[in-house]
Swiss-Prot record:
GO terms for cellular component: extracellular region. Residues 1-21 form the signal peptide. Belongs to the anophelin family. Residues 24-103 are annotated as: Disordered. Keywords: Blood coagulation cascade inhibiting toxin, Hemostasis impairing toxin, Secreted, Signal, Toxin. The keyword Isomerase does not apply. GO terms for molecular function: molecular function inhibitor activity; toxin activity. Transmembrane segments: none annotated. This is Salivary thrombin inhibitor anophelin. Residues 56-68 are annotated as: Blocks exosite I of host thrombin. Salivary protein with anticoagulant activity that inhibits host thrombin (F2); binds to the proteinase in a reverse orientation (opposite to substrates). The keyword Signal applies.
């Protein structure tokens, strides 16, 4: 029982230490950052943010390959797939049982 209390006290102490080590800001106080963290030269624009690229470059034929993705059947739930896997298991099961009966 004493060991449980010791562990609980240690966990509470660890929680207090973690909470107190977090930076404390007063209401309305805005945290400041180092200027070198946001170097303008190191920031790169997003590839789609370029206004020079128009929608005329979009090729809808690229989507045709995946057009039936929401309605395509899952091969894992395909009954033919399940029948094939069941017959494979049944075919291997008699072979294993016949080798046991030979002994």
């Amino acid at each position: 029982m004493a060991s449980k209390l010791f562990v609980l006290a240690f966990l509470c102490l660890a929680l207090v230490v973690v909470v107190q080590s977090a930076p404390q800001y007063a209401r309305g106080d805005v945290p400041t950052y180092d200027e070198e963290d946001f170097d303008e030269e190191s920031l790169k624009p997003h590839s789609s943010s370029s206004s020079d690229d128009g929608e005329e470059e979009f090729d809808p034929s690229l989507l045709e390959e995946h057009a039936d993705a929401p309605t395509a059947r899952d091969p894992g739930r395909n009954p033919e797939f399940l029948r094939n896997s069941n017959t494979d298991e049944q075919a291997s099961a008699p072979a294993a049982s016949s080798s046991e009966s030979d002994e």
